[in-house]
Regions:
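Thiamine diphosphate
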Residues: 1-129
Length: 129
């Protein structure tokens, strides 16, 4: 039996994005100035032309991802759960959900396990949203 390798969820997410990027040229990754924290920097290093840093602007990133999706791209939005679910909820609902667009949302640092970032970065609501 093989040994199970324990890694942080964000590390597994980054590895999966790179694998998807190798197989599918339409995959693009967007982040909200959190490439180091969400580990999307790994994708950026492999495919810099398919990585977009949207700055600290999750709602705007949602609109960008929606637009890319309408052009045949498969965007993966990446941010902390508090900001991907909480801050951008209306844009996710209206710009991605209602038109049924093919946008993926990768949210790291969920729940109350964000450590030193504190209460403003903790998200318990993400499951409900």
């Amino acid at each position: 039996m093989s040994e199970v390798k324990k890694v942080a969820t964000r590390v597994g997410y980054a590895e999966a994005l790179v694998e998807l990027g190798k197989e599918h040229e339409e995959v693009v990754v967007l982040d909200a100035d959190l490439a180091a924290a969400t580990q999307t920097k790994v994708f950026r290093e492999q495919f810099p032309e398919r990585h977009i840093d949207c700055g600290i602007a999750e709602a705007n990133m949602t609109g960008i991802a929606a637009g890319l999706s309408t052009c045949g791209k498969v965007p993966f939005m990446s941010s902390f759960a508090m900001f991907a679910a909480g801050r951008a909820f209306e844009q996710v609902r209206n710009s991605i959900g209602y038109p049924h667009l093919n946008v993926k949302i990768g949210a790291t640092h969920a729940g109350i396990s964000v450590g030193e970032d504190g209460a403003t970065h903790q998200c318990n609501e993400d499951i409900a949203l």
